[in-house]
Amino acid sequence: MKALLLSTSLALLVGGAVADDGRHTNVITPDAVKWTENPAFPKGIQIATLVGDPTKAGETVVQRIKFPPNFTMPPHTHPFSEVVTVISGNIGTNSGEKPERKGDLLKPGSMWVYPKGHAHYAWTGDGEAVLQVQYTGPGGIQYVNPADDPRKK
């Protein structure tokens, strides 16, 4: 009986510690997403940071990127690996240093991973598209062709 009482007491203590660990859940609804322009991206693209601080090393970052219709994102690389998911619309993506609209437009729910330093580009069809990107900061973008970098214009 003492063993049962001790086991039950320990379970309650451990359970209470896990349940009250100070963490909470942040829920972000679509209407709460705050879109902004980013000088590192071409005009027409909007970005929303949902989780994390892209300037901090080691921080998990989740961002959404909204692309206008009939748009091509120039070839670029990042200093991180990225996990990308199509949230809405249709978008094509490919690897390489020259943008060619070859391949299918991917539908919502499609996802892919680009490794750190991997040159890639994207394009949209007739409609707007939204991607969700997850990476470990710090963020950054380097254009394959420096003339494509809007920060230098």
Model-derived features: positions:
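Glycine- and acidic-residue-biased ligand/ion/polar-headgroup-sensing regions
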Residues: 68-71, 77-98
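A short, N-terminal "cap"/entry segment at the start of jelly-roll beta-barrel domains
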Residues: 18-59, 146-153
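Mid-chain, well-packed structural core segment of small domains
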Residues: 91-108, 112
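Bacterial N-terminal signal peptides
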Residues: 7-15
